[in-house]
């Protein structure tokens, strides 16, 4: 068996899971860098209690759940129907399905292969490293002897970028804007200062896409969303850019592969109330045919590259 596991943070599928998501996220040492486990757990509890009601209210505006799980499951289902060489499934970091239950579904031995596929085009210790560490620890814990490979850092992949360009131009044909905003999930500046590769990868990716799209837009803007707390984060903020922009714009969520609360609610709803300009949002790759083509191409000629922090 060749088992491909997509890795993501996950999205709450009901209002109760909002608390589960927050608790697990802020207990992640790559997210909340407090070395003392007990102190980190206490601080995580405080943050969770402070934020859970607001998160639940936001989720109510999306119908009470994130679309991430359903879209990822649809992607797996389509890929499993499209071919029979690989079996596709997915694991979330902070809400079900967790690594333990997914790995227990399969009987794996030394002749089998597990391909870990974090659904993040750019590397960060807060996403890719954290996800891979959890999976590799669980594989060891369950004494699984299968060979393990990793797909990591795919923002330079030509198929992937052709897909993005196609999706952007398709949206532009229906909403003619001369400004394209690349919105990436922000990170605290302190994480970048410790050597995290994320900002460099995002900047590189924007330059690649600008070159491909330079004849279609007059202006490109890179901005960062989802800032949390009083510390310094990567800037400029997407919300600030929209609040000060006069002309129509398109937004592409460059750091996301699957639509989630950050795209559907934050970019699609919340920022509409802050924006000075008219804008439209381009969907993530999700379960599109082009994304499936890229995935199958990647696992057949692996782009695997180990990156440590």
Swiss-Prot record:
Disulfide bonds: none annotated. Pathway: Porphyrin-containing compound metabolism; protoheme biosynthesis; protoheme from protoporphyrin-IX: step 1/1. Fe cation binds at residues 185, 262. GO terms for molecular function: ferrochelatase activity; metal ion binding. One of its GO terms (biological process) is heme biosynthetic process. It catalyses: heme b + 2 H(+) = protoporphyrin IX + Fe(2+). Keywords: Cytoplasm, Heme biosynthesis, Iron, Lyase, Metal-binding, Porphyrin biosynthesis. It is found in: Cytoplasm. GO terms for cellular component: cytoplasm. Gene3D superfamilies: 3.40.50.1400. Its EC number is 4.98.1.1. Belongs to the ferrochelatase family. Catalyzes the ferrous insertion into protoporphyrin IX. PANTHER family: FERROCHELATASE, FERROCHELATASE, MITOCHONDRIAL. This is Ferrochelatase. It comes from Campylobacter jejuni subsp. jejuni serotype O:23/36 (strain 81-176). The gene is hemH.
């Amino acid at each position: 068996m060749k088992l491909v596991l997509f890795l993501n943070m996950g999205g709450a599928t009901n209002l109760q899971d909002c608390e589960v998501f927050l608790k697990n996220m802020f207990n992640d040492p790559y997210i909340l860098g407090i070395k003392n486990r007990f102190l980190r757990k206490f601080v995580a509890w405080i943050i969770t209690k402070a934020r859970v009601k607001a998160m639940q209210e936001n989720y109510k505006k999306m119908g009470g759940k994130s679309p991430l799980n359903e879209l990822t499951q649809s992607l797996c289902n389509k890929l499993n129907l499209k071919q029979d060489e690989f079996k596709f499934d997915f694991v979330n970091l902070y809400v079900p399905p967790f690594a333990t239950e997914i790995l227990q579904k399969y009987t794996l031995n030394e002749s089998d292969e597990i391909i870990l596929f974090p659904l993040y085009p750019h590397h960060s210790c807060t996403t890719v490293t954290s996800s891979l560490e959890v999976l590799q620890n669980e594989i060891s814990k369950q004494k699984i002897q299968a060979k393990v490979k990793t797909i990591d850092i795919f923002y330079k992949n030509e198929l992937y970028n052709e897909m993005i360009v196609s999706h952007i131009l398709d949206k532009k044909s229906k909403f003619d804007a001369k400004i394209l905003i690349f919105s990436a999930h922000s990170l605290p500046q302190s994480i970048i200062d410790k050597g995290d590769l994320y900002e460099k990868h995002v900047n590189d990716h924007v330059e690649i896409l600008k070159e491909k799209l330079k004849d279609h837009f007059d202006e490109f803007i890179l901005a960062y969303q989802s800032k949390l707390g009083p510390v310094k984060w990567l800037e400029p903020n997407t919300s600030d850019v929209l609040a000060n922009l006069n002309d129509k714009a398109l937004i592409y969520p460059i750091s996301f592969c699957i639509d989630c609360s950050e795209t559907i609610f934050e970019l699609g709803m919340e920022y509409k109330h802050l924006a000075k300009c008219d804008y439209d949002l381009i969907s993530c790759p999700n379960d599109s045919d082009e994304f499936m083509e890229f995935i199958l191409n990647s696992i057949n000629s692996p782009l695997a590259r180990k990156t440590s922090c």
